[in-house]
Structures are given as C-alpha cells and as structure tokens.
Regions:
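Helix-rich effector regions associated with P-loop NTPase G domains
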Residues: 3, 15, 38-52, 57-83, ...
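Phosphate-binding glycine-rich loops and their immediate beta-loop-alpha structural context
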Residues: 88-137
Length: 330
C-alpha cells in the first residue's frame, strides 16, 4: 500500500478530517499547515507515513456547495453530481429560499432534483405543490424544474427517488462513486430520508463525533456516507448538509439569479428592454413591466399575478446577490 495516496474527505472539523481511501474503513487525519482547508467530499493527497496521517494537498474541485452572507462564506461540500433539495408542506418551505439555493446550484453547474417530501400528508402536500408552482417556469417559457414526490412512511415512498438517482448519477469513472448532496430547510424531513437511504448513518455519525471529541449534532456540519448498494449497482456517496433557515447568495451575480427566472429572457425575444442593464424593477421601457400591464389590460389576471409574483421574488433575490439595484436615471 503506497505511503501517499488519494483519499476522500467524509467529514471535516477544524484541523482534523475523517477520510476514506477507496472503500476502506475511515481514518482520522490532520491537515498539514494552516493554508490547507478541507471540506466534505474533497479529494485530497494523504500522507500515511505520519501518525496520524496528514492531508498535504486538496485536489481541484469540480464544484462546491456554498452559501454566503456578505464576507462570511460557508462551504458545505465539494464535487457534487446531484443535489436533492428537500421540500415539504409541513412545515411549509420558502419559495424564495428555494430559488436562492437553485441559483447557487446552477452557478456551480450542479444538477438538482426538487423532492416534495412527506407526500403521505394530503393537505400539506397540496400546499407544497401550490408553492412549488410559484417557482416553476411559466409553461411557455421553459421546461419545469425536475421534481418528484417522496415519503418515509409508505413501503414504496422512495421508489421514484431511487429511480431518479439511478438515472441521474452515473459513476464519474469506473473507480469513483457518484456524490449526492442532501439539502433543505430545517424541518423538511431530511434526517428521516437520510436514515432510510443510509440505515447506519446515526452510528457512523456517533463514531466520528466521539473520535473528534466534538459532541456536535450531525446537522451542524456536512458529512458523507457510503450508500449501501445491491451487487452490480454503482457505488454512491450521500452527503448530508446542515439544514438552514436562510441561504445567503451575496457571492452570486445578476446573471446567476436570472438563471432561475427564464421568463425574463423569453419575454425579451419579442423586444428588448430600453436599457441593457434593466433590472425589471421600475425602469421605463421594461418588457417585464409591459407584459404585466398587457396581461391586466387583456383581463388575463392569473397571468398578470403570476408575472408580478415572479417579479417580486426576482427583486428579493436581486437585492441579496452581488448585483446592486440598477434603477436607471437616464
């Protein structure tokens, strides 16, 4: 066995990290030097000549999950092949927060699947689907964001989820697992999903916490788990990320935010806004505002309300991104 090898970070905690080499048991390693900062699912160079082993290098990341409020950045995980964004109607998820996460995922070129959880609860599920419709593209503008129903109470409650994972997570190479991130606001049922997908997750978390002497709950930092797979199935890694109430996007620009509002580019196919940097807020000659007025004048109130709702959500995201309000004074 070589003294230096490539390992995968399963959980990082300060100057320490649990790492996995191939499918071997995890080992506790230390970061070499203050300039090295590891996050969950990083690929790293591990020197096993020392005791404990040392992480000497972080290999290039294909992407990273992060949220940011001003100068405070929180990197959650790296090298993600699919993000599962968990929603529910009890408690109700926030359409605005969901759009924030989606914009962050699109900016990092991370495919995502919206999972409406707790689908065994009829009333809350209908409320969740109504909220989901607010963030779906208007039918004529773009395809729907991919979504499924799921629940942990019924025998077949996760069948659709397993099928989507099988379709959307091809192995990166013959020697690597695909990596799936589990994300969601607090209370969406993410932990229940995790415990079904990885039955020994609690035991793994407890062992790691005891070794790190952290005593921290599983949802305070990201942790990767190897998902049990039937013989012949591809290997998968599931990354549980901390639940959140807010999701900062000050690291995103206006184009990133616009990626989850395809209506704006579709509307401008018939004619551009007067100003190239139009923020679709109060500027004269704005095609978005014109479309809302046209719908009102034509008595198409449902369309007008849908566009105005989109515009309000857009304004909220834009004010939080690295994209100042560009109200023209020309």
């Amino acid at each position: 066995m070589p003294d230096r090898c490539i390992a995968r970070v399963m959980r990082a905690h300060g100057a320490n990290a649990w790492v996995e080499v191939n499918a071997e048991a995890m080992v506790l390693a230390q970061l070499k030097g203050r300039s090295i900062e590891a996050i969950t699912n990083d690929r790293v160079v591990l020197d096993r000549q020392t005791d404990p082993p040392q992480i000497t290098e972080i290999l290039e990341r294909r992407n990273s999950l992060l949220r940011q409020e001003g100068h405070r950045e929180k990197r959650l995980a790296a090298n993600i092949d699919l993000a599962l964004l968990i929603l529910s109607g009890e408690p109700s998820f926030s359409p605005e927060t969901t759009l924030r996460v989606m914009a962050g995922l699109v900016a990092q070129q991370i495919p995502f699947l919206l999972v409406v959880n707790k689908s065994d609860l009829d009333g809350p599920t209908q409320m969740a689907l109504k909220s989901l419709s607010r963030i779906q593209p208007m039918p004529e503008t773009a395809p729907e964001w991919p979504w499924i129903l799921a629940n942990t109470k019924q025998v077949n409650g996760l069948d659709a989820l397993h099928q989507e994972i099988e379709l959307n997570c091809p192995a990166v190479s013959s020697s690597e697992s695909s990596s799936i991130a589990l994300m969601g606001e607090s209370g969406m049922g993410k932990s229940s999903l995790l415990n079904l997908l990885v039955p020994d997750a609690n035991a793994q978390t407890q062992a790691i916490s005891e070794a790190l002497s952290s005593g921290r709950h599983t949802t305070t930092s990201s942790q990767a788990y190897r998902m049990p797979q039937a013989p012949g199935k591809r290997s998968l890694r599931l990354i549980d990320t901390p639940g959140f109430q807010r999701f900062g996007i000050s690291h995103l620009d206006r184009e990133d935010v616009a990626s989850v509002f395809p209506e704006w580019s579709w509307l401008q196919q018939g004619g551009s806004c007067r100003f190239q940097d139009c923020a679709h807020l109060h500027e004269p000659g704005c095609v978005v505002q014109a479309a809302i007025k046209t719908a009102v004048d034509a008595g198409q109130l449902a369309r007008a309300n849908a566009l105005e709702d989109k515009r309000i959500l857009w304004e909220r995201l834009l004010s939080s991104a690295n994209a100042p309000d560009r109200r023209s004074t020309r």
